[in-house]
Amino acid sequence: MKKLFFLLLLLFLIYLGYDYVNEALFSQEKVEFQNYDQNPKEHLENSGTSENTQEKTITEEQVYQGNLLLINSKYPVRQESVKSDIVNLSKHDELINGYGLLDSNIYMSKEIAQKFSEMVNDAVKGGVSHFIINSGYRDFDEQSVLYQEMGAEYALPAGYSEHNSGLSLDVGSSLTKMERAPEGKWIEENAWKYGFILRYPEDKTELTGIQYEPWHIRYVGLPHSAIMKEKNFVLEEYMDYLKEEKTISVSVNGEKYEIFYYPVTKNTTIHVPTNLRYEISGNNIDGVIVTVFPGSTHTNSRR
């Protein structure tokens, strides 16, 4: 009897230890900001890094390409804005890792499917393991049919849904509705660590124009998801924040990122680093955002 008691006690302590380690890991997530009252060029010159920068010409088309596009009733998706790596997930077993599909016609950006799989695998390690993808990318024709069948109360016209961009997906739980499921709570608390945001939170319906959708997540990438989580921003607020601040330095878990906003009219010249990785994304309105990543790898991309 004593042996059984000690065995149960040992198992209980192991459980507590695991839970404590998980809590400790999550509590270490840290976001620190530094804003600069100057334009991007001045910041680069004053920081002594201007010799490591080069000029780059940005065209108006780039305003409508990237992971940070604001898509809503005012700013629709353009056909050229759609992610170029859309695939049928049911034909890519390597991308379906840790979650299920509602049916065999779920399409997604390959890049974002990989990010989602990484996130879900970490959730599974913590005991949250009943994720399914109910909807991913929809082309404009499919969106038009959905709008005609469902009406304005339940669907958006073609071009006005984030699903038309390839940047968003609807996530469900095989247990219950997302507002009650462990999967829904986990996403709300942790998705930002993997570059995802809950696009339509319950307390921001007046800003987004969309009712609360605990299942709809959107990829924006780090450090943007971390900033939005820390400041309780939806994408509409974040775009305004970037335009107002113009230059932001942020540390996420000790990794320093720099973010620059540039307004774009016709062909605009901006400054980018020559020795650091960076990404350029449009905002789908009137400018581009340059994100400079930690490290010294000289690669860049236009998302």
Swiss-Prot record:
Fetch the Pfam families from UniProt. VanY
Q: What is its EC number?
A: 3.4.17.-
The biological process GO terms on file are: cell wall organization; peptidoglycan biosynthetic process; proteolysis; regulation of cell shape
Tell me if Zinc is a UniProt keyword of this record: yes
Lineage, top-rank taxon, reads: Bacteria
Question: In the UniProt entry, which residues are flagged as the active site?
Answer: E213 (proton donor/acceptor)
Q: Where is this region: Disordered?
A: 37-56
Activity modulation notes: The DD-carboxypeptidase activity is not inhibited by beta-lactam antibiotics.
Primary location recorded for the protein, binned into one broad class: membrane
Q: Which GO terms describe its cellular component?
A: plasma membrane
EC class (word): hydrolase
* Induction or repression: By vancomycin. Part of the van gene cluster of pIP816, the plasmid that confers high-level resistance to vancomycin in E.faecium BM4147.
Arranged from A to Z, the UniProt key words for this protein are:
Carboxypeptidase, Cell membrane, Cell shape, Cell wall biogenesis/degradation, Hydrolase, Membrane, Metal-binding, Peptidoglycan synthesis, Plasmid, Protease, Transmembrane, Transmembrane helix, Zinc
Membrane topology term reads: Single-pass membrane protein
Q: Known InterPro entries for this protein?
A: Bact_PeptidoProc_Enz (IPR052179), Hedgehog_sig/DD-Pept_Zn-bd_sf (IPR009045), Pept_M15B (IPR003709)
**Binding locations of substrate:** Y154, A155, L156, S161
Summarizing the function annotation, the protein's role is:
Cleaves the C-terminal D-alanine residue of UDP-muramyl-pentapeptide (UDP-MurNAc-L-Ala-D-Glu-mDAP-D-Ala-D-Ala) or diacetyl-L-Lys-D-Ala-D-Ala. However the physiological substrate likely contains L-Lys instead of mDAP at the third position of the pentapeptide. Also releases the C-terminal D-lactate from UDP-MurNAc-L-Ala-D-Glu-mDAP-D-Ala-D-lactate, a depsipeptide produced by the vancomycin resistance protein VanA. Therefore, VanY should contribute in vivo to the hydrolysis of both the D-alanyl-D-alanine- and the depsipeptide-containing peptidoglycan precursors.
* NCBIfam families referenced in this protein's UniProt entry, alphabetically: vanY_AFMPt
**This protein is called what?**
D-alanyl-D-alanine carboxypeptidase
Q: Which organism is it from?
A: Enterococcus faecium
Q: Which taxonomic lineage does the organism of this UniProt entry have? A: Bacteria, Bacillati, Bacillota, Bacilli, Lactobacillales
